[in-house]
């Protein structure tokens, strides 16, 4: 059962104006570096920390373990999107795994997160489902076997999907769609409230006409996060129609969304965004039926473009989806 989050993540919480200004600078710098063409080598590789641990984990599995949690790279389970599911039956804390295998699983999770992001996700797992030991993993493909499709580690459970794929799927950030959340109904106590605050700064920068264009009544279904490509139509206001200062706020929101993850994935995500036409091709929508605190800080919002879907559903608690790629997995 979820309980109130009161500690465990020292850097989580409200986003101060000073922090947001610093984030804006980081976002502008990051997107500028994409334009310089310096991110071609930015994606994770088989030698990245998380992927190295995942390969070691695979090598440690017995044949009986492989029959339960190891699949071909193109298995349908790798493509499923859900905010609450067990990709395989054993939990990390089960006797199914050895203590050394649990250490390796933790190393993968540390490897795909930033320092703050790791603290958040561990607190999230504790609050939402009793901790890291209650989540599930699967392995797809085999390490070093690129000719068979690739190799990917995936962790799932309540409000969480994380992946490490060593760029097995070129042009797809994070190895495919990822999920995060928090089962707390008070927005200001949600672990990812800083993302709502960042989006709210965009909304509060809009003039009356822009606010009408950005405001939508009913949100799309929760799992509507597949990439639509350049032929897609997107809800809300087009970011390219906003002022430069407003676009910087959108960039800062993107950087806030990406902040929990490792630098390699962040850089690849920004590269993919650039390849899709950049931030100006995105639309941003705010779903005004969702206002938990009755404060006109909209709890559900969406950033979407040809290569990007960030869908944050903060009501009745957080279910959030991030899908960044030149194609769907």
Task: Give the positions of each predicted feature.
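N-terminal secretory signal peptides
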Residues: 1-19, 28, 33
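Boundary at the C-terminal end of the N-terminal hydrophobic targeting segment
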Residues: 40-42
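A cross-kingdom marker for long, charged
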Residues: 44-63, 67-114, 119-329
């Amino acid at each position: 059962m979820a309980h109130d989050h009161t500690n465990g993540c020292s850097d989580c919480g409200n986003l101060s104006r000073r922090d947001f200004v610093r984030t804006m600078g980081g976002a502008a710098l990051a997107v500028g570096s994409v334009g310089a063409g310096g991110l071609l080598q930015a994606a994770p590789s088989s030698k990245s920390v998380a992927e190295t641990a995942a390969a070691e984990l695979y090598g440690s599995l017995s044949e009986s373990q492989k029959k339960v949690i190891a699949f071909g790279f193109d298995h349908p389970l790798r493509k499923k999107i859900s905010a609450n599911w067990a990709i395989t039956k054993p939990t990390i804390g089960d006797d199914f795994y050895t203590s050394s295998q649990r250490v390796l699983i933790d190393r993968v999770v540390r490897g795909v997160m930033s320092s703050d992001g790791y603290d958040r996700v561990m607190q999230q797992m504790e609050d939402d489902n009793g901790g890291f030991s209650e989540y599930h993993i699967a392995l797809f493909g085999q390490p070093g076997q690129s000719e068979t499709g690739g190799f990917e580690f995936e962790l799932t459970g309540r409000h969480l999907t994380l992946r490490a794929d060593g760029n097995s799927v070129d042009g797809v950030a994070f190895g495919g769609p990822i999920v995060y959340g928090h089962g707390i109904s008070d927005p200001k106590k949600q672990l990812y409230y800083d993302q709502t605050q960042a989006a709210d700064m965009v909304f509060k920068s809009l003039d009356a006409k822009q606010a009408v264009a950005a405001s939508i009544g009913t949100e799309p279904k929760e799992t509507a996060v597949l990439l639509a490509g350049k032929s897609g139509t997107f809800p809300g206001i087009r970011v390219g129609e906003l002022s430069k200062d407003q676009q910087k706020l959108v960039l800062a929101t993107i950087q806030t969304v990406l902040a929990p993850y490792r630098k390699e994935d962040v850089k690849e995500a920004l590269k993919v965004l650039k390849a899709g036409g950049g931030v100006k091709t995105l639309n941003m929508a705010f779903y005004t039926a969702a206002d938990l605190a009755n404060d006109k800080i909209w709890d559900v919002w969406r950033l979407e473009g040809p290569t990007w879907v960030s869908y944050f559903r903060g009501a009745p608690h957080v279910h959030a989806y991030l899908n960044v790629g030149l194609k769907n997995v």
